């Protein structure tokens, strides 16, 4: 589990390698990730955008930006959480993801809530110990 807090918005990520959607012989690897966004602040906030940075094992960076998440722009009152699951395909057996969600408070303040850096590991990853 990976977690971070920005301005009392806690973002937690769980990842899972999905072998039935992966084929090492075809350099096709797939992970599911579940994100939970918890509003621990005293203000209602709305998630209006996302910015993902996805890096594969070769260091190739892909950035994905867009409105909302999974077709929604959830509004979170104080104490509420929103959870969703999505997926990430790569052509390498491991990688990392990070990014941010654009949040707007009920007062109109806009800020970026950090998504923690999390690893995408598979049984095909070469483990290196320093």
UniProtKB/Swiss-Prot annotation:
Transmembrane segments: none annotated. Pfam families: DUF525. Residues 3-127 form the ApaG domain. Gene3D superfamilies: ApaG domain. One of its GO terms (biological process) is error-free translesion synthesis. It comes from the Bacteria. NCBIfam families: PRK05461.1. HAMAP family: ApaG. This is Protein ApaG. The gene is apaG.
């Amino acid at each position: 589990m990976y977690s971070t807090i920005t301005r009392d918005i806690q973002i937690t990520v769980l990842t899972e390698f999905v072998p039935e959607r992966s084929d090492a012989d075809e350099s096709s690897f797939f992970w599911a990730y579940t994100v939970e966004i918890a509003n621990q602040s005293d203000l209602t906030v709305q998630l209006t955008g996302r910015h993902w940075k996805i890096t594969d094992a070769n260091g190739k960076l892909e950035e994905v930006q867009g409105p909302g998440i999974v077709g929604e722009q959830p509004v979170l009152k104080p104490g509420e959480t929103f959870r969703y699951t999505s997926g990430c395909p790569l052509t390498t057996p491991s990688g990392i993801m990070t990014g941010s969600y654009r949040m707007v408070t009920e007062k109109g303040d806009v800020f970026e809530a950090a998504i923690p850096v999390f690893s995408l590991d598979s049984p095909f990853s070469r483990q290196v110990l320093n």
